[in-house]
Curated annotation (Swiss-Prot):
HAMAP family: Ribosomal_uS2_B. Keywords: Ribonucleoprotein, Ribosomal protein. It comes from the Bacteria. GO terms for molecular function: structural constituent of ribosome. Belongs to the universal ribosomal protein uS2 family. It comes from Pseudomonas fluorescens (strain Pf0-1). One of its GO terms (cellular component) is cytosolic small ribosomal subunit. The keyword Ribonucleoprotein applies. Signal peptide: none annotated. SUPFAM superfamilies: Ribosomal protein S2. This is Small ribosomal subunit protein uS2.
Length: 245
């Protein structure tokens, strides 16, 4: 079972929240106090919630379900892409396109266009075009790859979302909520936990903290896949219901 410990979180600065004047009262029960006008997150509450989320992800992966990693702000994008690739999970690291979940039919068509352009780039088609047309297609390919490259192999809707900054990725969370897709999210002291099924109260800005979240989640996916034993997609719905109770 994938687990993190208190020392890991302290070293990563998970306990440092935002300035006290920016706090969200809905996160009050996860705040230990304040130091130099910075809220300090109660890691004794974060620890079991983080590990519960890791267990959920591991069991999902064990059932061959897909977890979509989402982190599009500058401090998160590179780490999200690297760790998602390490565990073979889909990811969004550049910009969340509206309708990425709720209008997946259109997104699927864009992914097909991306794949077609990739084939053309490799089979010499671009070389046969005029310079202007080749440049236009190359730019189109780069744009599509930046937006959709992380989900081109997803194959369908994900079974869960893992989100680094719930404020920054609110559109993604809203879409997941509409479709009944469970959401795991890192929630800082300035954010609202609404719409998040598995809350991880913690610093969503520090690079080391983001590395801890993403590395731990990727490890959970890998561990789950290495222990495949009859999990099912229905498990996600069961866990969501249990979390709501």
């Amino acid at each position: 079972m994938s687990q993190v410990n208190m020392r890991d979180m302290l070293k990563a600065g998970v306990h440092f929240g935002h300035q006290t004047r920016y706090w969200n009262p809905k996160m009050g029960k996860y705040i230990f106090g304040a130091r130099n006008k910075i809220h300090i997150i109660n890691l004794e509450k974060t620890l079991p919630m983080f590990n519960e989320a890791l267990t959920f992800v591991e069991r999902l992966a064990q059932g061959k379900n897909k977890i979509l990693f989402v982190g599009t702000k500058r401090s998160a994008g590179k780490i999200v892409a690297e760790e998602a690739a390490r565990c073979g999970s889909p990811y969004v690291d550049h910009r969340w396109l509206g309708g990425m979940l709720t209008n997946f039919k259109t997104i699927r068509a864009s992914i097909k266009r991306l794949r077609d352009l990739e084939v053309q780039a490799e089979d010499g088609t671009f070389a046969k075009l005029t310079k202007k047309e080749a440049l236009m297609r190359t730019r189109d390919l780069e744009k599509l790859d930046r937006s959709l490259g992380g989900i081109k192999d997803m194959g369908g809707l994900p079974d869960a979302l893992f989100v680094i900054d719930v404020d920054h990725e609110r559109i993604a969370i809203t879409e997941a909520n509409k479709l009944g897709i469970p959401v795991i999210g890192v929630v800082d002291t300035n954010s609202s936990p609404e719409g998040v099924d598995y809350i991880i109260p913690g610093n969503d800005d520090a690079i080391r903290a983001i590395q801890l979240y993403m590395g731990s989640m990727a490890d959970a996916v890998i561990r789950g896949r290495n222990n495949v034993a009859g999990g099912t997609v229905e498990f996600a719905a069961e866990e969501t219901q249990a979390a709501a109770e």
